[in-house]
């Protein structure tokens, strides 16, 4: 795959930021923080654009809560202005990266989803005697930041875009992972390694797929 470059102009384009703001407020339009942002929408977006251009953008703190159904999960809600940035980034990187996905990647992809995955599974099940069902325990809390960044650098060469991705990843709040490491896992010492992406971010829904696909391709 040819690495993606020159993504930054699309990300910081004002029209893309407007589009991202509309995407981020879907289903949340009348919440106080969204109303406050939209009251001075142009000024807020221009400020975001300036911060991105000058590399002074810093993600804000997360609001966290826990859900228990179907199992206990820590949900992290980013500030609204950060969600606008997430959409602006994904508008630029998702379409080209999506084209590199294998056909059986169904999560968070337009035109795919659970129904298509189920249909595909039924086809496999009818032609096979054995089925392996498995899950990755604590997947989001266990995602290694350094490994994720290294994989993304195989796919993206635009330095400005990588700066923003790193900023978002580094801004992740603690996810309460169990801190397990394996023999030979010596990229960094356990104390220095940072792991975990917040469940709730748009970027957290898409970026981990790159790890899954890379693992399959390896």
Q: Would you name each region that the model predicts?
A:
Residues 41-72:
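Active-site-flanking structural segment that lines cofactor/substrate pockets
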Residues 1-46:
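Non-catalytic, polymerase-adjacent accessory regions of viral genome-replication enzymes
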Residues 7, 90-144:
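Active-site-proximal segment of RNA-dependent polymerases
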Residues 27-35, 60-87, 100-112, 172-209:
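Short, conserved non-catalytic motifs in the polymerase core
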Residues 52, 56, 69-71, 81, ...:
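Generic hydrophobic/packing signal
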Residues 44, 51, 104, 123-218:
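Conserved polymerase palm-domain catalytic core
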Residues 11-26, 59-64, 91-96, 126:
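Short, compositionally biased low-complexity segments
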């Amino acid at each position: 795959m040819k690495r993606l470059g020159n993504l930054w102009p699309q990300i910081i384009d004002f029209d893309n930021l407007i589009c991202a703001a509309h995407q981020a407020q879907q289903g949340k339009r009348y919440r106080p923080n969204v109303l406050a942002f939209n009251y001075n929408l142009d000024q807020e977006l221009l400020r975001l654009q300036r911060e991105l251009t000058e590399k002074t953008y810093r993600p804000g703190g997360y609001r966290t809560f826990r859900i228990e159904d179907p199992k206990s999960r820590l949900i992290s809600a980013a500030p609204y202005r950060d969600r606008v940035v997430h959409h602006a980034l994904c508008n630029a990187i998702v379409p080209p990266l999506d084209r590199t996905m294998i056909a059986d990647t169904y999560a968070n992809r337009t035109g795919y989803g659970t129904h298509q995955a189920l249909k595909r599974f039924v086809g496999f099940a009818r032609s096979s005697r054995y089925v392996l069902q498995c899950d990755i325990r604590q997947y989001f809390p266990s995602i290694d930041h350094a490994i994720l960044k290294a994989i993304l650098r195989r796919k993206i060469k635009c330095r400005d875009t990588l700066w923003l991705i790193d900023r978002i990843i580094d801004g992740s709040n603690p996810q309460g992972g169990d801190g397990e490491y394996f023999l030979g896992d010596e990229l960094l010492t356990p104390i220095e390694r940072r792991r975990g992406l917040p469940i709730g971010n748009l970027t957290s829904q898409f970026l981990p797929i790159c790890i899954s696909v890379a693992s399959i391709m390896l």
